[in-house]
């Protein structure tokens, strides 16, 4: 049986590039014919327990990794029952054991740790569900739902969602 010299291989293994740990992604979706998008960082689970550990309960979370998560709509929307005028915003979440909230914030262009509550436009409740299998990469989706859409965010064994529709 061939053998491997672990001590000799270790420096090369340790020096290999890891790549981007939390790659950026943009997801687009249609809301009554209008293109909305979310630009966000996608952290990996890497075997960790996420909510309540990596992302603590009852603390505003950047909803992704690195730079703040941005959301753009060219039309006025209703997000979870709250009015969101056309524009670009940042999205934050407040996870708790008793329920989650989505925060739409007016400040843009900042790092994900630079949250200012005084710039909040709205806070809305999110629907929370437990998934049967863990999701490795934090994932945002905008899925068709009638004339509107559902904004869904999934990571580990948790999925949160909120309806979005064009304001009439």
Mark where each language-model region is.
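Primarily secretory-pathway and cell-envelope proteins
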Residues: 1-59, 108, 112-168
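Mid-length scaffold segments of soluble, non-membrane domains
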Residues: 59-111
